[in-house]
Amino acid sequence: MARTQAEPPASQPDARAAWLRDQLERANYAYYVLDQPDLPDAEYDRLFRELQQLETDHPELVTPDSPTQRVGGEAAGGFTPVVHDAPMLSLNNGFADEDIVAFDKRVADALAKTTDLAGSVTDPVEYACELKFDGLAISLRYEQGVFVQAATRGDGTTGEDVTENVRTIRSIPLKLKGKHVPAVLDVRGEVLMFKRDFARLNERQRAAEQREFANPRNAAAGSLRQLDSKITAQRPLSFFAYGIGVLDGMPMPDTHSALLDWYESLGLPVNRERAVVHGAEGLLDFFRKVGEKRESLPYDIDGVVYKVNRRDEQERLGFVSRAPRFALAHKFPAQEALTKLVAIDVQVGRTGAITPVARLEPVFVGGATVTNATLHNEDEVRRKDIRIGDTVIVRRAGDVIPEVVGALLDRRPADAAEFVMPTECPVCGSKIERLPDEAIARCTGGLFCPAQRKQALWHFAQRRALDIDGLGEKIIDQLVELNLVRTPADLFNLGFATLAELDRFAEKSAQNLIDSLEKAKHTTLARFIYGLGIRHVGESTAKDLAKHFGSLTPIMDASIEELLEVNDVGPIVAESLHQFFAEEHNRTVIEQLRAPGKVTWPEGPPAPKAPQGVLAGKTVVLTGTLPNLTRDAAKEMLEAAGAKVAGSVSKKTDYVVAGAEAGSKLAKAEELGIPVLDEDGLHQLLEGNTP
């Protein structure tokens, strides 16, 4: 939804109020009618509070259609309007502890004034505390215990009839339990989608190549407002009851907590994360406890709700135009907020991964001030169309690294600049490469790059590489931070006196590490190659390289085509090896490691090239006695041709060579349909002919 109107300054209250009303109404329309929210909740709350304050300071600016005078958006087309018998009001919000203390004081003072002891000190107020679900508010109507209608909140007075869709939600009873049910009951509650159900729904959307939902709230809202209830029936929606509209034929429970207990006895789903507390201290304690378990809950919440527990006290407190005086929503720090993206830098990870990072104007989100946020990778920046200068949505949930969710395209300045991935590492200057079919670009600096230094040293020292006992991560951290070690070659220059001065490093530990370094100087070529930490080169590949080439220099000088001749080395591994050894920095470090008095290993001649004939890689079984060849001679000839000689017949056998008195192996081959050859057939294979 475009917001093209220029933003007036606070010094023009008339124009500012009109602009705020316009922004909020557009957001309401996108949120409630289109189900396409384009403004983060925190930004909406900020604009709403500003308009409230402006209208308080300038009462003449209040208009009948101001968003402060009603709850939400109008009913959308396609559904029958439903007028609520009792309004579905929203709640006022609190954010800081001070807001909660002030709410409790207002309630206590108001209750005191309505008693005979006006103004006197009373006992702490009793409150019912619940979770604030991130879903869609609805009203369920039961007549004589039978479900007859469901309606969305809409604008609080008129909603939309979604009865047929709600019938598909299995947690909602179509008939209330018990013999004594009211003549009419309007149940207020929330339709939502559990996290696990949301994940499964998006899996199905991906499999069907359909658009995925952004979050569980959007999925729940979109599912509930489907014109075809068959689609809703396929969506895993849930419901929790938390309030009441109309009750006829039975007395109203005395307290809100008793209402929820009664709902449970009727078979209505009520959330168990609730409590009855006293005073502001009890409210804040409940909030903190819920906050600690928030991330582990199976559904999304954005705060908690406090309600004066006693029904008679609720009635005495009454309502303001938009919300009840007896209730408050205590919201968690916003998980999303708007700010300006001022630059995009790249960060080099411990394995050389290049990550674009957004530099932001400071914004408070998720309980902390955020100035940087991840953009993940180059493809994500392109997909989200994020540019320098954009107004962006930043998300921070719990301990998760802040990320840029997207940009508000209608606020994009004319000079917004696209991100360009650098070609050289900003830390070491080495070439940045991105392999085919990979989302992550990487610095090829390897051993030389300071950003990768600690990881490279740790890998070089681990047991399956140079096996430097006593060189753990904490020691490596100190060595790097004190600038004592820059590359693996520097490890072998360390002396006893230097090591003994390290924090928490006794003389015995220093001597043990010196001994380990001396021992590590004598290794194998395979261990050395593995210790270099070349991407995609594991122990097995390192052994294959050492066996194939025999020495290090031919590996370093090999072309991609020559590397592809090595057993189990494919295009990705060959490209990674070639890039690593093409970097002059890496070759320099290797030469330093091979200097006199440093690392040595035995070298040998390259292995004979593997046969490429028709028998290469085939499995052959010998059975019986051949006329002219002994079994050992036949085996040597087959292995020289690249075949593997097995001792038993299976589905993996390619040929069976059978002589006199072949026995059970021949029978098994015939049973499995495996080709059986005599000695002449064997010679044809050895000569490169397929029999």
UniProtKB/Swiss-Prot annotation:
GO terms for cellular component: cytosol. One of its GO terms (molecular function) is DNA ligase (NAD+) activity. NAD(+) binds at residues 41-45, 90-91, 130, 153, 190, 307, 331. SMART domains: BRCT, HhH1, LIGANc. PROSITE patterns: BRCT (PS50172), DNA_LIGASE_N1 (PS01055), DNA_LIGASE_N2 (PS01056). GO terms for biological process: DNA repair; DNA replication. Its EC number is 6.5.1.2. Keywords: DNA damage, DNA repair, DNA replication, Ligase, Magnesium, Manganese, Metal-binding, NAD, Zinc. Its cofactor is Mg(2+); Mn(2+). Zn(2+) binds at residues 425, 428, 443, 449. It comes from the Bacteria. InterPro entries: BRCT_dom (IPR001357), BRCT_dom_sf (IPR036420), DisA/LigA_HHH (IPR041663), DNA_ligase (IPR001679), DNA_ligase_AS (IPR018239), DNA_ligase_CS (IPR033136), DNAligase_adenylation (IPR013839), DNAligase_N (IPR013840). Residues 610-691 form the BRCT domain. The active site is at 132 (n6-amp-lysine intermediate). It catalyses: NAD(+) + (deoxyribonucleotide)n-3'-hydroxyl + 5'-phospho-(deoxyribonucleotide)m = (deoxyribonucleotide)n+m + AMP + beta-nicotinamide D-nucleotide. Disulfide bonds: none annotated. Belongs to the NAD-dependent DNA ligase family. LigA subfamily. DNA ligase that catalyzes the formation of phosphodiester linkages between 5'-phosphoryl and 3'-hydroxyl groups in double-stranded DNA using NAD as a coenzyme and as the energy source for the reaction. It is essential for DNA replication and repair of damaged DNA. This is DNA ligase.
